[in-house]
């Protein structure tokens, strides 16, 4: 008997809707990353993208504990001398709240082509409206 390995053509991928309102940022990101990896499925295979599609709404209403709103910083470098841009988590949540959750989940996924394919299945939106009603996502309570 041989060990089962999933094939990319035969993997069943479902669509799930997650409401981020009142959820802790890190705990939500961890569960989203596990679902994108496919670790919640019995057919999980490390070298095959077995994860589901995730639609996250109300990203601006995510919660953080402690003083992270003022003490946690995101840095990005423009490539020019002296242009290291920094902004706190509070500022980032005001400017682009969906990106905060995307960065948290992306850091938990593999670095490489497979990780990028998994990351593309994450759809994050501010507010409760999303353009994926045609896929009929199932509500997922995390």
From Swiss-Prot:
**Which one Pfam family would you cite for this protein?**
Ribosomal_L13
Q: Which GO terms describe its biological process?
A: negative regulation of translation; translation
Q: Name one GO molecular function term.
A: structural constituent of ribosome
Q: Which PROSITE patterns match?
A: RIBOSOMAL_L13
Q: Which CDD domains match?
A: Ribosomal_L13
The answer, when asked if Ribonucleoprotein is one of the entry's keywords, is: yes
- Write the record's keywords in alphabetical order, separated by commas: Ribonucleoprotein, Ribosomal protein
Task: List the record's Gene Ontology CC terms alphabetically.
Answer: cytosolic large ribosomal subunit
**Record has Ribonucleoprotein as a keyword:** yes
Please report any disulfide bonds recorded for this protein chain, giving both cysteine positions: none
Q: Which InterPro entries match?
A: Ribosomal_uL13 (IPR005822), Ribosomal_uL13_bac-type (IPR005823), Ribosomal_uL13_CS (IPR023563), Ribosomal_uL13_sf (IPR036899)
Function of the molecule: This protein is one of the early assembly proteins of the 50S ribosomal subunit, although it is not seen to bind rRNA by itself. It is important during the early stages of 50S assembly.
Instruction: Give the UniProt family note.
Output: Belongs to the universal ribosomal protein uL13 family.
Complexes and interactors: Part of the 50S ribosomal subunit.
Q: What is this protein called?
A: Large ribosomal subunit protein uL13
Q: Which organism is it from?
A: Xylella fastidiosa (strain 9a5c)
Report the gene name. Answer: rplM
């Amino acid at each position: 008997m041989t060990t089962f390995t999933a094939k990319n053509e035969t993997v069943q991928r479902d669509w799930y809707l997650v409401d981020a309102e009142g959820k802790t940022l890190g705990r939500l990101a961890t569960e989203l990353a596990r679902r994108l990896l496919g670790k919640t499925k019995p057919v999980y295979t490390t070298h095959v993208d077995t994860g589901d599609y995730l639609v996250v709404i109300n990203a601006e209403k995510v919660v953080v504990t402690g003083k992270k709103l003022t003490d946690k910083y995101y840095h990005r470098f423009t490539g020019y001398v002296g242009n290291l841009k920094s902004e706190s988590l509070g500022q980032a949540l005001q400017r682009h709240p969906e990106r905060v959750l995307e960065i948290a989940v992306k850091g938990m996924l593999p670095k490489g082509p497979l990780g990028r394919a998994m990351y593309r299945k994450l759809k994050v939106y501010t507010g409760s409206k999303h353009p994926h009603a045609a896929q009929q996502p199932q509500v997922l309570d995390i």
